[in-house]
């Protein structure tokens, strides 16, 4: 079968098509024919060497497919079931511990850039019944990250204000989920064309941050001076001064991305004045994923997919991601 492998120390020119032998499932394991995967910044960081990975690692943390064989002792899944991977296969629920955050596919272990995988049955949930494989594959990292920020960590209510930044996978699905919850959304982007699309998805106010350097202050004013209850922070340290300006008293900034840099200064006095919280978010638990899937099914939410590439063109998919031209998610079909 075909798989894409990464030659250490990484780089987009170090992703190669390889032939590997599928492995029969052992006790507690299932074999899954992977139908689709989707790109996340985490995957980009792995393949470019920002996150070191073993030589020969099969990348990609998201996977959706069909169970083709079941090992002894498996009772939760059966042959023919449509399944979706967990980003953290060891994190069942509750607050995370360090061991919960280990074993990430495509990083700590081989991932889903392969036509067939054999893994513990506990590495998969059922797929949303209303989605195809490509759409489902967008949820296990980006979708669950947005869900945890909006629902698990913040417990937003209808009418609350949410600020989303840009038009990447997490930001777009966060906008969709926020509107699904009855929240009001302010969206920022450097592209008027993308802002128009964000508006069509339900963003109430649109800010081109290239034209408005003090976009946080503008967002604060657009709420009538109340401020936003949640900032879905994908930019990281370079954005924090404006994100804090946008924040309501007792609001939360969910830090889920570091596009402006891995480290930087935090205007702590401004955050304290707002009685605000800066909360790091890395995806979510298996219990969170079950709740997210139930909501996606109940509301028939359809993730936004920009482009889909074949497996052999995974490098091209990453180059397109690198160009930042995409709106929503980039998928790979196997």
Positions of predicted regions on the chain:
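C-terminal capping/lid region of NAD(P)-dependent oxidoreductase domains
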Residues: 225, 300-304, 316-334
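N-terminal Rossmann-fold NAD(P) dinucleotide-binding loop
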Residues: 171-172
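Glycine-rich beta-strand-centered segment in the early N-terminal region that forms part
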Residues: 21-37, 47-92, 108-110, 128-130
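Glycine-rich phosphate-binding loop and adjacent beta-alpha segment
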Residues: 100-102, 181, 192, 198-199, ...
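NAD(P)H dinucleotide-binding glycine-rich loop of Rossmann-like/cofactor-binding domains
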Residues: 87-165
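Adenosine-nucleotide cofactor-binding segment
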Residues: 164, 179-239
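Residue-level marker of beta-strand positions
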Residues: 64-66, 82, 116, 161, ...
